[in-house]
Amino acid sequence: MALLSAVKGKLISVIGDEDTCVGFLLGGIGEINKNRHPNFMVVDKNTAVSEIEDCFKRFIKRDDIDIILINQNYAEMIRHVIDAHTSPTPAVLEIPSKDHPYDASKDSILRRAKGMFNPDDMVANRG
Protein backbone atom coordinates (compact mmCIF):
# COMPACT_ATOMS: atom_id res chain seq x y z
CA MET A 1 0.00 0.00 0.00
CA ALA A 2 1.12 3.54 -0.72
CA LEU A 3 2.43 5.63 2.12
CA LEU A 4 1.22 9.14 2.86
CA SER A 5 3.87 11.75 2.20
CA ALA A 6 5.55 13.61 5.03
CA VAL A 7 3.29 16.58 4.33
CA LYS A 8 0.16 14.46 4.63
CA GLY A 9 -0.82 14.42 0.97
CA LYS A 10 -4.38 13.73 -0.05
CA LEU A 11 -5.54 10.51 -1.69
CA ILE A 12 -7.15 9.46 -4.93
CA SER A 13 -9.98 6.97 -4.50
CA VAL A 14 -11.42 4.60 -7.10
CA ILE A 15 -14.84 3.04 -7.58
CA GLY A 16 -14.60 0.69 -10.52
CA ASP A 17 -14.51 -2.74 -12.02
CA GLU A 18 -11.72 -5.15 -11.11
CA ASP A 19 -9.48 -4.20 -14.04
CA THR A 20 -9.74 -0.48 -13.28
CA CYS A 21 -9.05 -0.91 -9.57
CA VAL A 22 -6.15 -3.30 -10.12
CA GLY A 23 -4.57 -0.89 -12.60
CA PHE A 24 -4.72 2.01 -10.17
CA LEU A 25 -3.60 -0.16 -7.25
CA LEU A 26 -0.57 -1.30 -9.25
CA GLY A 27 0.08 2.40 -9.88
CA GLY A 28 0.34 2.90 -6.13
CA ILE A 29 -2.89 4.61 -5.10
CA GLY A 30 -4.00 1.91 -2.64
CA GLU A 31 -4.33 3.06 0.96
CA ILE A 32 -6.04 1.85 4.11
CA ASN A 33 -6.67 4.59 6.67
CA LYS A 34 -6.30 4.32 10.44
CA ASN A 35 -9.88 3.04 10.67
CA ARG A 36 -8.98 0.23 8.23
CA HIS A 37 -11.12 1.66 5.41
CA PRO A 38 -9.65 1.34 1.89
CA ASN A 39 -9.75 4.14 -0.68
CA PHE A 40 -11.09 1.87 -3.41
CA MET A 41 -14.12 -0.28 -4.14
CA VAL A 42 -14.21 -3.13 -6.64
CA VAL A 43 -17.65 -3.36 -8.25
CA ASP A 44 -18.84 -6.55 -9.89
CA LYS A 45 -22.12 -7.86 -11.29
CA ASN A 46 -23.28 -8.85 -7.79
CA THR A 47 -22.68 -5.42 -6.24
CA ALA A 48 -25.89 -3.64 -5.28
CA VAL A 49 -26.40 -0.04 -6.40
CA SER A 50 -26.91 0.88 -2.74
CA GLU A 51 -23.38 -0.38 -1.97
CA ILE A 52 -21.90 1.85 -4.70
CA GLU A 53 -23.92 4.79 -3.41
CA ASP A 54 -22.86 4.18 0.21
CA CYS A 55 -19.20 3.91 -0.80
CA PHE A 56 -19.37 7.17 -2.77
CA LYS A 57 -20.98 8.93 0.21
CA ARG A 58 -18.23 7.60 2.51
CA PHE A 59 -15.52 8.82 0.13
CA ILE A 60 -16.94 12.36 -0.11
CA LYS A 61 -17.02 12.59 3.70
CA ARG A 62 -13.39 11.53 4.15
CA ASP A 63 -11.01 14.45 4.65
CA ASP A 64 -8.03 12.48 3.31
CA ILE A 65 -9.52 12.06 -0.20
CA ASP A 66 -9.25 14.85 -2.79
CA ILE A 67 -10.18 12.99 -6.00
CA ILE A 68 -12.74 10.25 -6.63
CA LEU A 69 -12.37 8.30 -9.87
CA ILE A 70 -15.45 6.33 -10.86
CA ASN A 71 -16.20 4.23 -13.92
CA GLN A 72 -18.80 6.15 -15.89
CA ASN A 73 -21.18 3.18 -16.11
CA TYR A 74 -21.28 3.02 -12.29
CA ALA A 75 -21.60 6.81 -12.05
CA GLU A 76 -24.74 6.51 -14.18
CA MET A 77 -26.22 4.16 -11.56
CA ILE A 78 -25.82 6.77 -8.81
CA ARG A 79 -26.17 9.93 -10.94
CA HIS A 80 -28.53 11.59 -8.44
CA VAL A 81 -25.94 11.27 -5.67
CA ILE A 82 -23.08 12.52 -7.85
CA ASP A 83 -25.14 15.49 -9.04
CA ALA A 84 -25.97 16.38 -5.42
CA HIS A 85 -22.23 16.65 -4.63
CA THR A 86 -21.41 20.29 -5.37
CA SER A 87 -18.31 20.80 -3.25
CA PRO A 88 -15.08 21.31 -5.22
CA THR A 89 -13.35 18.64 -3.15
CA PRO A 90 -13.23 15.84 -3.49
CA ALA A 91 -13.32 16.28 -7.24
CA VAL A 92 -15.25 13.54 -9.05
CA LEU A 93 -13.89 12.30 -12.36
CA GLU A 94 -15.76 9.81 -14.50
CA ILE A 95 -13.48 7.43 -16.35
CA PRO A 96 -14.04 4.69 -18.95
CA SER A 97 -13.87 1.00 -18.18
CA LYS A 98 -12.65 -1.84 -20.34
CA ASP A 99 -16.17 -2.65 -21.52
CA HIS A 100 -17.75 0.83 -21.45
CA PRO A 101 -16.08 3.70 -23.33
CA TYR A 102 -16.26 7.24 -21.99
CA ASP A 103 -19.24 9.29 -23.24
CA ALA A 104 -18.85 13.02 -22.55
CA SER A 105 -22.58 13.59 -23.08
CA LYS A 106 -23.33 11.53 -19.95
CA ASP A 107 -20.79 13.31 -17.72
CA SER A 108 -22.82 15.81 -15.66
CA ILE A 109 -19.71 17.17 -13.96
CA LEU A 110 -18.12 17.97 -17.33
CA ARG A 111 -21.35 19.70 -18.42
CA ARG A 112 -21.30 21.74 -15.20
CA ALA A 113 -17.66 22.73 -15.77
CA LYS A 114 -18.32 23.71 -19.39
CA GLY A 115 -21.13 25.97 -18.19
CA MET A 116 -18.64 27.95 -16.09
CA PHE A 117 -16.58 29.05 -19.10
CA ASN A 118 -17.48 30.97 -22.22
CA PRO A 119 -15.48 29.65 -25.23
CA ASP A 120 -15.23 33.20 -26.63
CA ASP A 121 -13.40 34.32 -23.47
CA MET A 122 -10.84 31.54 -23.94
CA VAL A 123 -10.04 32.69 -27.50
CA ALA A 124 -9.86 36.37 -26.45
CA ASN A 125 -7.38 35.56 -23.65
CA ARG A 126 -4.90 33.90 -26.03
CA GLY A 127 -3.83 37.13 -27.72
Curated annotation (Swiss-Prot):
This is V-type proton ATPase subunit F. Signal peptide: none annotated. Subunit of the V1 complex of vacuolar(H+)-ATPase (V-ATPase), a multisubunit enzyme composed of a peripheral complex (V1) that hydrolyzes ATP and a membrane integral complex (V0) that translocates protons. V-ATPase is responsible for acidifying and maintaining the pH of intracellular compartments and in some cell types, is targeted to the plasma membrane, where it is responsible for acidifying the extracellular environment. PANTHER family: V-TYPE PROTON ATPASE SUBUNIT F, VACUOLAR ATP SYNTHASE SUBUNIT F. Keywords: Hydrogen ion transport, Ion transport, Transport. Pfam families: ATP-synt_F (PF01990). It comes from Aedes aegypti (Yellowfever mosquito). Belongs to the V-ATPase F subunit family. The keyword Zinc-finger does not apply. V-ATPase is a heteromultimeric enzyme made up of two complexes: the ATP-hydrolytic V1 complex and the proton translocation V0 complex. The V1 complex consists of three catalytic AB heterodimers that form a heterohexamer, three peripheral stalks each consisting of EG heterodimers, one central rotor including subunits D and F, and the regulatory subunits C and H. The proton translocation complex V0 consists of the proton transport subunit a, a ring of proteolipid subunits c9c'', rotary subunit d, subunits e and f, and the accessory subunits VhaAC45 and ATP6AP2. GO terms for molecular function: proton-transporting ATPase activity, rotational mechanism. One of its GO terms (cellular component) is proton-transporting V-type ATPase, V1 domain.
